[in-house]
Amino acid sequence: MATPAAVNPPEMASDIPGSVTLPVAPMAATGQVRMAGAMPARGGKRRSGMDFDDEDGEGPSKFSRENHSEIERRRRNKMTQYITELSDMVPTCSALARKPDKLTILRMAVSHMKSMRGTGNKSTDGAYKPSFLTEQELKHLILEAADGFLFVVAAETGRVIYVSDSVTPVLNQPQSEWFGSTLYEQVHPDDVEKLREQLCTSENSMTGRILDLKTGTVKKEGQQSSMRMCMGSRRSFICRMRCGNAPLDHLPLNRITTMRKRFRNGLGPVKEGEAQYAVVHCTGYIKAWPPAGMSIPEEDADVGQGSKYCLVAIGRLQVTSSPVCMDMSGMSVPTEFLSRHNSDGIITFVDPRCISVIGYQPQDLLGKDILEFCHPEDQSHLRESFQQVVKLKGQVLSVMYRFRTKNREWLLIRTSSFTFQNPYSDEIEYVICTNTNVKQLQQQQAELEVHQRDGLSSYDLSQVPVPNLPTGVHEAGKPVEKADAIFSQERDPRFAEMFAGISASEKKMMSSASASGSQQIYSQGSPFPAGHSGKAFSSSVVHVPGVNDIQSSSSTGQNISQISRQLNQGQVAWTGSRPPFPGQPSKTQSSAFGIGSSHPYPADPSSYSPLSSPAASSPSGNAYPSLANRTPGFAESGQSGGQFQGRPSEVWSQWQSQHHGQQSGEQHSHQQPGQTEVFQDMLPMPGDPTQGTGNYNIEDFADLGMFPPFSE
């Protein structure tokens, strides 16, 4: 049976595209056709371009599969690129140590957008502050720690929405000058365009390239420009803001430090009538305005405060690169200035203080060799020092030379220089010099020393009072005048109760006993060592409140007379040494109280026989041989020039023992250290609770202070 191809071989051949040469045998032609149809499946890629005409039957399906794979690959690349940009925009993602996966990036981005829109979890809104602090207290603490002020500005118009009251101590401007104005009015005119770029959120806000600080590569702005529209994108810029001229008296005292810092961080002295500016570093975020759940009043929307975004930032004073020596008073004169040179000595930078030191403007010195201003005799010395400091690499080298000022005078300058090296290449970049006017520095130091010396000499000596003593006669015949007015002082208010407790009858009673103590122990012709004038009376004076200064005398009557006189004159406190008042009948220096003193005072044996032994007048002997077992801490005269070390309650017992020795010459029996002594024949003390009784305990005086210390 014949096949269709065998019946009509030419028709079969006509269905095959292209020209095919058929052999004579029909079956051979049919086999040749089938082989031709099966060949593209095995070696289609190695066929010549002419043979691709045979593949048009399966071509559309193959090309569609290849196009689908390419489209998927491009879509994945774009998604990876967008997620990478999203990761850079979200602060929480960029802060991670390792790169997060795509799901983490999307989750963090959603959380960040919710927090920016104010739709986050309300239960955690108050977790950022302690429970015991209010919002106002927290705001003041943050602003005080930041040493700046908080302000909110509309992004589109620049109108000030809010400013904290701390703007007054920082910029010396009240809040009223900021409210109702724009931030463009508060900054320097040259910084307006820079501020407008920071407030703008459009795609075309900035052009150029951006340096990626993480990788160190420079990227085009088009890759990062989408960050400008992010509501939580960070802003950090430096600008010059206008300062006010409010008087300092209206500011609190704790803001004086901030005011000094603002003057030091200023841009130098300004001309009369010109506005003064301070360098302010502003850091903050662009946020949505108004926040979620808050509506803007109609009057605010009419004036243009209905912006979609706002800048919330904190402004802090920025330390300027040019040091300014002007203080608040403006009286300090600089004595030094900084300069920067290359290795050849050419000046590349000089700070403005050179105007006050050498008279030149900074532009007059830039680009010139420092040797041009040096004295010809010192040029070789200065050149060698520059060569040496380059070799030292970082070490400081000082040199003194004569510098020619602008008024053609030679000024002695001390220059301390060192080199700055590039940390990567270890090459010397430049030389930094500190130039000091030696003469002016010495003058300022001398003035400071004189001021300190004057401050010590102007010490008020009225704080060291001396009682107004009556006029007496020195043993040499020279009169002793009364104390000057500088030694006068009112009664100490600490002992007002004690003075108030003294009645008129007590004063009269004590003054009546002054007649019995009129005799003198020493004759007027007895020698009195002159070296005693510089001796401190702290070792021979007993200080008791109410009975100010009692020096030992020959009898109890003289002591009581002295007490009465001092009570009428006022309260006295000793702080050290004072000029003595020798030769006074009522106050005589006794050898019995010369503890630690190296000046023996001769006494009349007839009138002073009980204490005229060498043991009483010797500086190293015991002043009270009969009381050696009672008061070991009080009568130890081996402590030269020392203060009393004994208990205050034992002073009266020794005073009474001296009284008995002078009147009757009887020897006291040795008493035990803890035994109580009774004073039968002693007048009661003013304000004594035991007044009217014959017996009382000497421990009642234990709380009376002896020689209270006073700092000079």
UniProtKB/Swiss-Prot annotation:
Residues covered by the PAS domain: 134-209, 323-393
Gene Ontology, cellular component aspect: aryl hydrocarbon receptor complex; cytoplasm; nucleoplasm; nucleus; transcription regulator complex
Single GO molecular function: DNA-binding transcription factor activity
Keywords associated with the record: DNA-binding, Methylation, Nucleus, Repeat, Transcription, Transcription regulation
Pfam families per the UniProt record, alphabetical: HLH, PAS, PAS_11
Basic and acidic residues compositional bias, start-end: 63-73
PANTHER family: CIRCADIAN PROTEIN CLOCK/ARNT/BMAL/PAS
UniProt-recorded name of the protein: Aryl hydrocarbon receptor nuclear translocator 2
Organism of provenance: Rattus norvegicus (Rat)
